[in-house]
Amino acid sequence: MYHGMNPSNGDGFLEQQQQQQQPQSPQRLLAVILWFQLALCFGPAQLTGGFDDLQVCADPGIPENGFRTPSGGVFFEGSVARFHCQDGFKLKGATKRLCLKHFNGTLGWIPSDNSICVQEDCRIPQIEDAEIHNKTYRHGEKLIITCHEGFKIRYPDLHNMVSLCRDDGTWNNLPICQGCLRPLASSNGYVNISELQTSFPVGTVISYRCFPGFKLDGSAYLECLQNLIWSSSPPRCLALEVCPLPPMVSHGDFVCHPRPCERYNHGTVVEFYCDPGYSLTSDYKYITCQYGEWFPSYQVYCIKSEQTWPSTHETLLTTWKIVAFTATSVLLVLLLVILARMFQTKFKAHFPPRGPPRSSSSDPDFVVVDGVPVMLPSYDEAVSGGLSALGPGYMASVGQGCPLPVDDQSPPAYPGSGDTDTGPGESETCDSVSGSSELLQSLYSPPRCQESTHPASDNPDIIASTAEEVASTSPGIDIADEIPLMEEDP
């Protein structure tokens, strides 16, 4: 793109000179051609004088930030030089100049003033923490920018919130994007910000710390507020009085809080402790550094303990011993229980317990009377032959309380009884029967001889049922055989 300026109405003389010189241009061209031909024929040395007699205009020059056409050569009378500017610049002066003869006969440029190129657009300004929206700005245009988050636009002239592009390519009232300014740092402390950072966006929080031996006076944290000022003034680091070395303790030592303790500054806490086997004389084991002095100010002592506590290793061994003893005891108890159970099982196998009478009639059974085993009849034998062996006289004696059998019957003869009278022999025989019955009752639970107390006038059915009970509840027992065995010698 080329920018130029058309000649104004005041250049009438220039136009008149152009019109006068137009017919002479071919003549001048012919003269130059003729001169070059003569130079070729006779040599340049012989024509030097003639070349010097030729008149030309001086070089008009090339404007800065622009260019000219033609860019070089010899400018004879009637020559024209045209000027142009680069992008972003505009031409100040004539766009073309003519080489003409003045009234005194010399050649010169008309107009005589040199043309220059001046900046046409304002360059994009470099503003930190900002975004420039337009890329080109011409004369009179307004700058449009947006600040980054946390920063706000500020103009030098608070009454004029506009920045315009001047005709000379510069800006007036150029703004900046500003945050909170860099706060001051204490000489005895430091702050967690970069040394190169000069502005901080809204919401930034910075922290202050003091060197050892100094105390922070003020807020340790500062925040950049919406009005672009800090939440409080920067704190100071004040020197503190340092406490001397804590008192030494025999058979003990101390630790400080917080660790490590390079210097015992104000607020440092020291905790005392004793070696193993020793204990403090006082329950209070802390002292605090306050303004260069330890508080409370007392001497700490460690004395030998009367009771020595086992070490961790010994305590661990004791614990394992208890656990092992308990486990061994439990295992032994379980083993004894298992052995007892096995022994009980084997014992039952060799000595089976007495139970109810066997249901099978073929299994033999016996009783021991005075050390002599007596085989008992089976149940079937006792039922079928028991009553027939006793005879009718015995059934009557059972109903009448064991009297002597009747005269027409032949009862079995009892040893030791020679007469058949109903005298003392009767009671002895009944007692013998009673004794045998008691023995049988203890083994097989037969009915007692209380049935003999019933009178003879009772119902015969009761007597018959009693006899059946004796026979049924005493299987395999022969009453006639048992009574002589139980009878004592007179």
Curated annotation (Swiss-Prot):
Region described as Disordered: spans on this chain: 1-21, 401-490
GO biological process: complement activation, classical pathway; innate immune response; negative regulation of complement activation, alternative pathway; negative regulation of complement activation, classical pathway; regulation of complement activation; regulation of postsynaptic neurotransmitter receptor internalization
Expression sites (tissue/organ): Isoform 3 is the predominant isoform in all tissues except cortex, cerebellum, kidney, and breast. Isoform 1 is found primarily in the esophagus and the brain.
Disulfide bond positions: 57-99, 85-117, 122-165, 147-177, 180-224, 210-237, 243-289, 274-302
Residue ranges, Extracellular side: 42-319
CDD domains assigned: CCP
GO CC annotation, single: postsynaptic membrane
Domain Sushi: 55-119, 120-179, 178-239, 241-304
Residues that carry a glycan: 104, 134, 192
Keyword Signal: yes
Gene3D superfamilies, per the entry: Complement Module, domain 1 (2.10.70.10)
N-terminal signal peptide: 1-41
Membrane spanning stretches: 320-340
Entry keywords, A to Z: Complement pathway, Disulfide bond, Glycoprotein, Immunity, Innate immunity, Membrane, Repeat, Secreted, Signal, Sushi, Transmembrane, Transmembrane helix
Biased composition (Acidic residues): 479-490
Stretches with biased composition (Polar residues): 430-456
Protein name per the record: Sushi domain-containing protein 4
Species name: Homo sapiens (Human)
Gene name, Swiss-Prot/TrEMBL: SUSD4
